[in-house]
């Protein structure tokens, strides 16, 4: 199904670009692959690459029919690029997918293999031996013919001819998010791909004189299209390393930029944070990042503080603030939708948080709560963005949040073999407007501010409590800032319906590896207090899990719906769990209260701490006398019950606002005993979340878990 945004067809294909580079005597294009120490492992020029591609294309001609899907299952290596381009050369459909590192991830490979209908798979980088084990456990994988690219005959006489293809035909299938058992493949046409790369080239100033440096996984759209294919389109050299090499030693990425005078690079937010945290001063010595023209930041969420910290750390080594280029994109629109201009510092917008929760864009002014959002740049040339009410399909006013709809030549053909979902997602028209443009519904929420797209969340992720909208990212960040044992960007907040029919908040949160055996009670307390203090809402359940247990897409985006299902199914690797034990404790607490005689200040102090400890299901040690009871997790219902229980205990009627009028245990005791109230204590400020910092296993998990990019 087409989106009615017909791409330009005069750009050729990526295979014809390769052929032109191979024939040019002055071509600068080459790919240099670095090993885990930063040494050159392999280098290949355009002519050699074209010869290798033609050899594999000839093999595909002998093994399959034009238009057939071909699985590409590779460890990071140059042979992946050879195989992908061989599919383009021969008119086959490339289906890139990462090889599973662990047995539990084979299901993803099986699902993609079955959904794509591939009968042939190309492998490389040591995957051939692994594939034999996978086939032993899977009838689906046994039905596929597996071939290592290294074993294919390179005799020029066997080389395949460059096929002429319809620019509107499918070029490759990019599998996106969904549960691991039901992946969705986006059909990207040759014209889609070439149009997106032409727009990115114009937006970010790529040319044959540029140099790309990338560690991004090639099975994912950002690493595949921007990291590799864009260099062929623009004719510039690329320096590549494996994701594992970066994760083990993040400064290796920066060293490669410095050494090869990289001009363009891209990474999710966590990578910049990882460099800031992991690159010791002695490792930074000698770095020169002044050659960089742009460093794309394309992960969601884009955290302004991460960019500020990176500039503060690496500004002394030539990195400029205006080098950062936040962007927004998705596989359904090939890759990029927006672009921040080159040599212009990113825009950050400080907004009224309460208004944003209500779907309104209001500058902070004197707002009690504020939130800072990064602009993701303006729409690429020829790309149209509309902010639409997802319920009515009508365009939203400029100061309102709505669903992001995208139109233009980069919008993909649809979902592979899913006409129903394609019809509901692609080629949609805005209600009440006479417009020939058919839009892509992204499922993302956002608004245009000062000409830039600002992404605020996902439609399905919204949590509605008492009529107010809450973004899970806000809850996750507030929680992760509360305690050093919690992994930043390692949590998933989602709404569930409680036994009483009301929406409740559940937070699944990863612990740092070194904190797994500690006492979880202070962590539960810190999370509850921070979320209350920051957002004035309660978390009903907190689930602490192993590092890497939170489900993510291949680009690191939290899959909140998948985590909710995993929590319900009991399949998460849980370390400890806390729940606000309301009904279970209410009766016991009331009985305890009735049995306790009133007393002096010290007795009242003890009684109040015990009552709150039981009611909130928190350890007694957390009932600090100068800590706000709201921070502890006391709700308005709890406050009314507390007033009644205290009144019964001391033998006098208290107003239902007792806990709000006297918000600490000290203040309550002072009021009840008749002594002067304790001076108010300013609430503690939680530590700022530094961004998307994760250790090796968590990042490897991110790379393995495929899904929406």
Describe the residue ranges of each PLM region:
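Flexible, low-complexity inter-domain linkers and amphipathic docking helices that mediate domain-domain
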Residues: 1-7, 504-505, 511-513, 518-525, ...
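N-lobe entry segment of adenylate-forming
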Residues: 1-62, 135, 140, 601, ...
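Conserved pre-ATP/AMP-binding loop-to-beta segment of ANL
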Residues: 27-29, 146-147, 154-175, 181-182, ...
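Conserved AMP-binding/adenylate-forming core of the ANL superfamily
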Residues: 31-85, 102-110, 162-164, 185-194
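AMP-binding/adenylate-forming catalytic core of the ANL superfamily
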Residues: 121, 258, 265, 408, ...
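Conserved AMP-binding/adenylation subdomain of ANL enzymes
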Residues: 194-211, 218-263, 278-283
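Gly/Ser/Thr-rich phosphate-binding loop
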Residues: 262-266, 278-370, 384, 392-394
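Conserved ATP-binding/catalytic segment of the ANL
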Residues: 374-384, 390-399, 403-465
């Amino acid at each position: 199904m087409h989106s009615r945004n017909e791409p330009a067809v005069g750009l050729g294909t990526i295979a014809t670009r390769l052929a032109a580079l191979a024939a040019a005597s002055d071509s600068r294009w080459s790919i240099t692959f670095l090993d885990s120490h930063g040494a050159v492992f392999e280098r290949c020029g355009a002519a050699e690459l074209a010869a290798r591609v033609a050899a594999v294309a000839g093999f595909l001609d002998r093994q399959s029919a034009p238009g057939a899907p071909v699985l590409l299952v590779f460890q990071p290596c140059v042979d992946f690029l050879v195989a992908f381009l061989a599919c383009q050369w021969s008119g086959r459909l490339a289906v890139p997918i990462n090889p599973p590192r662990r047995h539990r991830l084979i299901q993803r490979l099986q699902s993609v293999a079955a959904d794509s209908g591939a009968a042939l798979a190309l492998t490389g980088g040591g995957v051939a031996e692994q594939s034999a084990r996978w086939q032993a456990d899977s009838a689906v994988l046994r039905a596929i013919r597996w071939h290592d690219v290294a074993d294919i005959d390179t005799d020029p006489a066997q080389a395949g001819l460059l096929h002429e293809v319809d620019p509107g035909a499918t070029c490759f299938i990019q599998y996106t998010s969904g549960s691991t058992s039901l992946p969705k493949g986006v059909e990207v046409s040759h014209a889609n791909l070439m149009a997106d790369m032409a727009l990115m080239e114009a937006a970010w100033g790529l040319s044959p004189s540029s140099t790309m440096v990338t560690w991004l996984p090639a099975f994912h759209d950002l690493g595949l299209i921007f990291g590799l294919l864009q260099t062929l389109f623009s004719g510039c050299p690329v320096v590549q390393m494996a994701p594992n090499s970066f994760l083990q030693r993040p400064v290796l990425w920066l060293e490669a930029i410095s050494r090869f005078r990289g001009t363009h690079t891209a990474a999710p937010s966590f990578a910049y944070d990882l460099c800031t945290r992991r690159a010791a001063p002695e490792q930074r010595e000698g770095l020169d990042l002044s050659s960089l023209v742009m460093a794309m930041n394309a992960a969601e969420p884009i955290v302004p503080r991460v960019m500020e910290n990176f500039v503060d750390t690496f500004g002394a080594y030539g990195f400029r603030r205006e080098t950062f280029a936040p962007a927004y994109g998705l596989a359904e629109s090939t890759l990029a939708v927006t672009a921040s201009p080159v040599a212009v510092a990113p825009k950050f917008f400080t907004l009224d948080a309460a208004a944003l929760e209500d779907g309104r864009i209001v500058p902070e002014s004197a707002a009690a709560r504020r939130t800072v959002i990064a602009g993701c740049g303006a729409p690429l040339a020829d790309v149209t963005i509309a902010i639409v009410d997802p319920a009515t399909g009508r365009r939203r006013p400029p100061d309102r949040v709505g669903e992001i709809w995208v139109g233009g030549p980069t919008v993909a053909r649809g979902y592979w073999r899913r006409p129903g979902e394609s019809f509901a997602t692609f080629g949609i028209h805005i209600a009440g407007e006479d417009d020939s443009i058919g839009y892509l519904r992204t499922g993302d929420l956002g608004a245009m501010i000062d000409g830039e797209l600002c992404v605020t969340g996902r439609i399905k992720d919204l949590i509605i409590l008492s009529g107010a909208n809450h973004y899970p990212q806000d809850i996750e960040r507030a929680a992760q800032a509360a305690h050093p044992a919690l992994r930043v960007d390692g949590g998933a907040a989602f709404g569930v319906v409680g036994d009483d029919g009301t929406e409740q908040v559940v937070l699944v949160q990863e612990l740092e590896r070194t904190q797994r055996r500690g006492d979880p009670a202070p962590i539960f307390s810190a999370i509850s207090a921070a979320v209350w203090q920051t957002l004035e809402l309660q978390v009903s359940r907190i689930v602490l899990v192993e590092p890497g247990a939170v489900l993510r897409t291949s680009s690191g985006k939290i899959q909140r719906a998948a985590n909710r299902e995993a929590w319900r199914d009991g399949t998460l690797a849980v370390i400890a769990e806390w729940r606000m034990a309301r009904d279970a404790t209410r009766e016991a607490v009331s009985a305890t209260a009735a049995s306790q005689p009133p007393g002096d200040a010290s007795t009242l102090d003890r009684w109040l701490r015990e009552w709150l400890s039981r009611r909130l299901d928190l350890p007694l040690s957390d009932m600090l006398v100068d800590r706000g009871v709201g921070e502890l997790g006391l709700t308005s219902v709890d406050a009314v019950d507390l007033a009644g229980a205290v009144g019964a205990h001391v033998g006098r009627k208290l107003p239902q606002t007792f806990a709000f009028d006297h918000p600490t245990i000290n203040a309550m005791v002072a009021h009840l005993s008749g002594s002067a109230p304790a001076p108010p204590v300013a609430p503690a400020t939680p530590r700022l979340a530094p961004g998307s910092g994760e250790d090796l296993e968590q990042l490897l998990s991110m790379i393995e878990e495929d899904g929406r990019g």
